[in-house]
Amino acid sequence: MAAASGYTDLREKLKSMTSRDNYKAGSREAAAAAAAAVAAAAAAAAAAEPYAAPGVKRKYPEDSDPERSDFEEQQLQKEEEARKVKSGIRQMRLFSQDECAKIEARIDEVVSRAEKGLYNEHTVDRAPLRNKYFFGEGYTYGAQLQKRGPGQERLYPPGDVDEIPEWVHQLVIQKLVEHRVIPEGFVNSAVINDYQPGGCIVSHVDPIHIFERPIVSVSFFSDSALCFGCKFQFKPIRVSEPVLSLPVRRGSVTVLSGYAADEITHCIRPQDIKERRAVIILRKTRLDAPRLETKSLSSSVLPPSYASDRLSGNNRDPALKPKRSHRKADPDAAHRPRILEMDKEENRRSVLLPAHRRAGRFSSENYRRKSYEPGEDCSEAAGSPARKVKMRRH
């Protein structure tokens, strides 16, 4: 049998079979080692490029991913801007609970006197969910000017607003002087902003050509927040995320200067006024601040020659709009949506829409009286105090 299989004896056949088994085992071990090496290489590649799909070569390395890089850049810019804002802010808690209560009682007296009509016309400025009371110096802003925008604000003539109440000097200003927050004699303008829940003030910069720096404010009645770098949208009102949200506590003093006062807007958001809140803003007007040269305006219609009578050298001050009524708002006024300047502009534009785009609630008589040819200046009937609105071509 051994001869038929080609082996001379059984020992040679056993030796031959052992050699083949060793060869096969070695081949299997080599194949396993090779497979392990390939798997290790793939794992290393996946670790190096975690966002790459299998078998797809990345076009950009991770560090140069455009979307990721843009997001990180925006975050870095926001953090840098927040750092600049913080560099221009000082905060301190100076007023105790008892001191706050005394000052808040005085603020209530101001509100009561205003409701009785005991202040000058330009001392009080009313808006839904927010009233302002100017003392020492007052100025025109926002809807009060026909020509709007930064740099158009003007101080009222001397005497058009009431003097700073003595209690503001004794209870507020003197304490700030004692703690060296402001120097003696710095303040000549005090404004009290009185907010109801949901009230707000849109993003703005205190007029640089009107007021010196710093700007000092003291908070009363409740806690809130002062936000920097927000953008407002209206109908419904919405506010973007701030660059910095600064908590302001009852009895705290906030001092703005530098970048925080001049290079970025600040605002009070509606969601940050959960309870009644008041703030006393103390400032100093610039010696070269522009001022209206005429006496206070009444709510009557201005004569056509009014503008020519208000020349001061080569400068013409923009005419004031008639002031709002000083009647007390009805009880439901605080619960209606706040009417802001962008809303008013949209309402004016809606009057000028063609017939097929107007709502059916407008009568033909109203349409006849409020329809004009494009490009013309339009106003109400003679004798109306309404401001002229220039139509836009669409």
From Swiss-Prot:
Cofactor: Fe(2+)
Sections of the chain in a coiled coil: 67-116
Disordered, as annotated region: 1-26, 48-83, 298-394
EC number(s) given by UniProt: 1.14.11.53
Residues carrying N6-acetyllysine: 132, 235
Cofactor note: Binds 1 Fe(2+) ion per subunit.
Matches recorded under PANTHER family: RNA DEMETHYLASE ALKBH5
The protein's assembly and partners: Monomer. Interacts with RBM33; promoting desumoylation by SENP1 and recruitment to N(6)-methyladenosine-containing mRNAs. Interacts (when acetylated by KAT8) with PSPC1; interaction facilitates recognition of N(6)-methyladenosine (m6A) mRNA.
The protein's role, per its UniProt record: Dioxygenase that specifically demethylates N(6)-methyladenosine (m6A) RNA, the most prevalent internal modification of messenger RNA (mRNA) in higher eukaryotes. Demethylates RNA by oxidative demethylation, which requires molecular oxygen, alpha-ketoglutarate and iron. Demethylation of m6A mRNA affects mRNA processing, translation and export. Can also demethylate N(6)-methyladenosine in single-stranded DNA (in vitro).
Protein family: Belongs to the alkB family.
Record protein name field: RNA demethylase ALKBH5
Upper taxonomic lineage: Eukaryota, Metazoa, Chordata, Craniata, Vertebrata
